[in-house]
C-alpha cells in the first residue's frame, strides 16, 4: 500500500490533529518506507509536543521547545494554526476554518480530547473562563497559568486525577499553597487503590499540597476574578488561582458531523478503520472494542499499527488492544500502575509491601503464576521487570514475593 495508482499524482494522506498520536503515525509511516503526500493539520499554533510534560514546563524544568515531538519532517508537512471544520467522506475533502478545501485519499483522525469543564456556578464570564480560572491541556494553557501564578497567593486544583496531581505539584514547586478538591474517596482512583492514594496524599502534604477527598466543588466566588471555591457542603476555600483538571473527553465532533459511528469515541475496528471507507482514527479520540484508553502508550501502539498498514510495511498488522501502563513522574511522588488493581478480584492473590518511612507502596495482583496488575508508588526500581512480565504474560517464579524488592526483581 506504499503507492497508489492515480496517474502521476501522489497518494494523499491527511492527518487531522498534530498531537502525540499524529506525530508518531507520521514519523513511523515515513520511517517504514511509506510514500505519500502526508499533511498534518494542527489547530494549535505550535508543532506537536508531549502533553505529559506540561507540568514540567510550568515549573520551568523544561522550555516549551524541549517537549516538541518529531513528526517525520521534512517528509511530512505540518500546517499549524489550521483548524479542520468539516469532513466530506464521500468527496474525500476537508474544509478548513479559513475557507480552503483540501482533498485526501486516506484520512487519519487524531483529534485528541477536550478538557472536561464541570457545570460550576461562576466558571464563565462573558463566555470565557473567569479570570483566575484555567484549564490545563495545552501549552497556551500552560503559559497563561504560569503568568497568573506569578501574582497569585493561593491555588485550588479541582480534580485529583493524574493531571490534577501534576498541576498541584507544579504550583507548589512555584511556591504557592495549593489545595486539591477531589470528588472520589482518594486520589487517582482510576489507577491507584485506597492505600496508594493515601500514601500519595501524604507525599503531597509534605510538598505543601492539602487534599480534600470526597468533596465536590459547586461554584467559584468572585466578581470579575476568582476569590474562592465553594464546596458542596458550603465551605469556601480561598483562592485567586483555580485549575480545572476534571479529565478529558474524546474530541468527536468532526467525526459525528461527518456521519461516522461514534459512541464515547470514534468507533474503530482492529485495523483502526472507522465506519467510513478510507478513514481511520487513533489516539485519545478512538474507541476500540468499547475502550477509550486516553493514555500515551495505547496511542503510540495504534499509531504504529496504522503506520505499518498504510506504509505497506505490514499490511496485515492489527491492533487487538493494549496492556497500558499509567505513569506519573513527579520526584518522590512518582508512580506506575498497570492491569487489574482492584480488591477482591476473583481468583487472584495480592502481595503488598509498604514503607511509611520512605513513602513507598507496592502491590502485585496475581492470578495463578501470572501477574495481572500492579501499583508501584515512590520506588520504581522494579517497574521494568514487572511491566515486562505483565506485558508478555510471563510465568512468575515460585516465590514471587522477592519481586517487590529491587534486587530480587533485577535477579529474576
Segment roles from a protein language model:
Residues 2-78, 168-191, 385:
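Beta1-alpha1 glycine-rich phosphate/pyrophosphate-binding loop at the start
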Residues 1-10, 69, 73-154, 230-232, ...:
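FAD-binding core/adjacent interface of flavoenzyme oxidoreductases
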Residues 128-150, 224-230, 235-305:
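FAD-site-proximal beta/loop scaffold in flavoenzymes
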Amino acid at each position: 500500500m506504499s503507492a497508489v495508482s492515480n496517474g502521476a499524482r501522489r497518494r494523499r494522506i491527511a492527518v487531522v490533529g498534530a498531537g502525540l498520536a499524529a506525530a508518531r503515525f507520521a514519523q513511523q509511516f515515513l520511517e517504514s518506507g511509506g510514500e505519500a503526500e502526508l499533511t498534518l493539520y494542527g489547530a494549535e499554533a505550535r508543532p506537536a509536543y508531549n502533553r505529559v510534560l506540561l507540568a514540567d514546563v510550568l515549573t520551568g524544568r523544561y522550555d516549551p521547545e524541549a517537549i516538541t515531538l518529531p513528526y517525520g519532517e521534512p517528509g511530512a508537512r505540518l500546517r499549524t494554526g489550521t483548524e479542520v471544520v468539516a469532513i466530506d467522506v464521500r468527496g474525500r475533502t476537508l474544509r478548513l476554518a479559513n475557507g480552503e478545501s483540501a482533498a485526501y485519499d486516506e484520512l487519519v483522525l487524531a483529534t485528541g480530547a477536550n478538557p472536561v469543564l464541570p457545570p460550576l456556578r461562576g466558571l464563565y464570564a462573558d463566555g470565557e473562563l473567569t479570570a483566575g480560572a484555567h484549564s490545563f491541556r495545552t501549552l497556551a494553557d500552560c503559559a497563561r497559568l504560569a503568568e497568573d501564578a506569578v501574582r497569585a497567593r493561593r491555588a485550588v486544583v479541582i480534580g485529583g486525577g493524574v493531571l490534577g496531581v501534576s498541576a498541584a505539584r507544579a504550583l507548589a514547586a512555584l511556591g504557592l499553597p495549593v489545595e486539591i478538591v477531589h470528588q472520589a474517596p482518594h486520589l487517582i482512583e482510576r489507577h491507584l487503590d485506597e492505600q496508594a492514594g493515601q500514601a500519595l496524599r501524604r507525599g503531597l502534604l509534605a510538598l505543601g499540597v492539602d487534599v480534600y477527598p470526597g468533596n465536590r466543588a459547586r461554584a467559584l466566588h468572585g466578581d470579575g476574578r476568582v476569590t474562592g471555591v465553594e464546596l458542596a457542603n458550603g465551605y469556601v476555600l480561598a483562592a485567586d488561582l483555580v485549575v480545572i483538571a476534571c479529565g478529558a473527553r474524546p474530541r468527536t465532533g468532526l467525526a459525528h458531523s461527518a456521519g461516522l459511528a461514534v459512541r464515547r469515541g470514534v468507533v474503530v475496528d482492529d485495523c483502526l478503520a472507522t465506519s467510513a471507507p478510507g478513514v481511520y482514527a487513533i489516539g485519545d479520540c478512538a474507541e476500540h472494542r468499547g475502550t477509550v484508553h486516553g493514555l500515551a502508550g495505547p496511542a503510540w501502539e495504534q499509531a504504529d499499527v496504522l503506520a505499518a498498514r498504510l506504509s505497506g510495511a505490514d499490511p496485515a498488522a492489527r491492533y487487538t488492544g493494549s496492556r497500558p501502563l499509567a505513569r506519573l513522574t513527579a520526584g518522590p511522588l512518582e508512580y506506575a500502575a498497570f492491569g487489574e488493581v482492584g480488591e477482591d478480584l476473583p481468583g487472584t492473590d495480592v502481595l503488598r509491601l509498604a514503607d511509611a518511612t520512605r513513602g513507598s507502596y507496592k502491590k502485585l495482583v496475581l492470578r495463578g503464576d501470572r501477574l495481572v496488575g500492579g501499583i508501584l508508588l515512590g520506588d520504581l526500581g522494579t517497574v521494568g521487570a514487572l511491566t515486562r512480565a505483565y506485558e508478555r504474560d510471563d510465568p512468575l517464579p515460585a516465590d514471587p514475593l522477592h519481586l517487590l524488592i529491587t534486587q530480587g526483581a533485577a535477579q529474576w
